[in-house]
A protein has these predicted regions:
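A structural signal for isolated positions on well-ordered beta-strands in alpha/beta enzyme cores
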Residues: 6-8, 126, 188
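Active-site pocket-lining segment
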Residues: 124-141
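Short, flexible segments with low predicted structural confidence
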Residues: 45-49, 87-89, 139, 149-150
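Polyanion-binding loop/helix "lid" in catalytic or ligand-binding cores
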Residues: 1, 60-119, 129, 145-193
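Short, glycine/serine-rich, charged loops/turns that create anion-binding
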Residues: 12, 88, 132
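Short acidic, glycine/serine/threonine-rich loops at helix termini
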Residues: 16-23, 94-98, 136-141
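Ligand-binding beta-strand-loop-alpha-helix segment within the catalytic cores
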Residues: 1-83
């Protein structure tokens, strides 16, 4: 089956008062020595020590509010194009009057995907990852793969810290957000295999 593919740079509005700006937590960039980390701090950047690896910059990871190119995405889909949008979570921007300003932040790509799927009134959100199934107690001798879970169970597992913050947690949070956003909506987290 042949279909044309369009890629679209996607600007995503975030709230300047999102708590994530007060508590930067998303690790970015290379690992640094203590001296390099001090220079970064002197520039006004946030730095976090990563045990056994050194130091790394951290920036805000606010929640997406609105995808500005939504009309363009819909038009391309109506033209039967395969649309690649919101790559890497999109470009975080702040609304300032009638202008947009880039935000020093990153947006979790899975959360942006849920926002986009909801905005497009999709029925299913498919999140691909490196494992076939979400698991409880991942990487331990009591690891339990899950075939399915309800929004209530997923929320309970999130509150129990069952999912790694850098890997599975954003996917499960996005799945819960999307599945909760309308009747009959489902989220699937699996590998491409």
């Amino acid at each position: 089956i042949y279909k044309p593919v369009s890629t679209l740079i996607t600007q995503v509005r975030v709230d300047p008062f999102d708590a994530a700006f007060s508590y930067p937590s998303k690790e970015i960039g290379r690992f640094m020595t203590e001296a390099e980390a001090k220079k970064e701090k002197d520039k006004g950047n946030h730095v976090k020590e990563i045990p056994g690896k050194g130091y790394q910059r951290v920036i805000a990871a606010p929640r997406p509010i609105e995808i500005y190119e939504l009309d363009a995405i819909k038009a391309l889909m109506d033209a039967e194009q395969i649309v690649i949008a919101a790559g890497g979570g999109g470009i975080p921007v702040l609304q300032q009057g009638t202008r947009l300003k880039g935000a020093s932040a990153v947006i979790e790509k899975d959360v942006t995907s849920a926002c986009l799927a909801e905005s497009l009134d999709a029925d299913i959100l498919l999140l691909l990852t490196g494992v076939e199934k979400v698991a409880l107690n991942y990487g331990t001798s009591t690891e339990t793969p899950l075939d399915a879970m309800s929004v209530e169970d997923a929320t309970k597992y999130i509150n129990e810290n069952q999912f790694s913050s850098g890997a599975m947690l954003p996917k499960v949070e996005a799945a819960v957000s999307f599945a909760s956003s309308g009747n009959g909506r489902k989220s699937i987290i699996t590998s491409i295999d």
